[in-house]
């Protein structure tokens, strides 16, 4: 992304000059990302932590360097942190305020909808092997929230995984980002018709159907759609096979549609973070984007798509449960868990002679 280019440049120059370049370039990710938003996130996290009792706080907070920070997943399993289920009438509003700060209004709505699907699964599964509970979603803090130091927040549970990492004055990152939906479409009960990821599915299918035969031959990969996202819950990922139709091979209208898909998937995040991601994609060159599809093209067909650029990967898979179960992830090759900004942060501290141990 845009921040990665600057990171590589800054490694080669003295700290004072590097800091000057950072301030002049005013990258949306690191500098504008925005201090006001960062301050709001710090305040919301602090208020939430202050609402916890000593025992809860001990479980909610880890050292920033703890291995647990990278231990992410999207399946129903036991987790570290404090769950929404155990919060009282004073604490729960603080957690809600925190999530509304870290997510866009649409993102918060989607998280609530994903949680509501746990009730649907509880109703339709017979002798299910997983515990289904809309309140088994956990908040975990790593480090001490501040503008100067490094810290992180994780919000995670079945089919939700959000990771925000703050690297001192260098900014914040917001991946891995995962949202899933099971069922993808609710077909019975009070929530009949709910499709949490409708736009993310429909926009991509519309792009697929707009392709000519010649374009489709490039965009649609042979074989069946994979049974899940290829990168799974890997802690670090690299680019997948360079396949699919390239941005320059699309018409202007199709190019716009591709960018709409990307922005829609980013838009669970606050507007400032969305703007940073889109700016980074454009800085790395939209001509380097590729869109690939596997599986059938009709609603109800098992299918998979991915969008890949030099610095990021989006994977979408809807094959499980008779193609009614979506997994959708956004990964950043350099920036997941703040790796790029943390390297820059530690280098800057070291060059300033402050002797950071990392």
Regions found by a protein language model. Name each.
Residues 2-15:
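Bacterial N-terminal signal peptides that target proteins for export
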Residues 7-10, 25, 342:
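Short, intrinsically disordered low-complexity segments
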Residues 12-24:
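Bacterial N-terminal signal peptides
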Residues 25-31:
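Signal peptide processing junction and immediate N-terminal pro/mature segment
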Residues 31-104, 108-358:
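A cross-kingdom marker for long, charged
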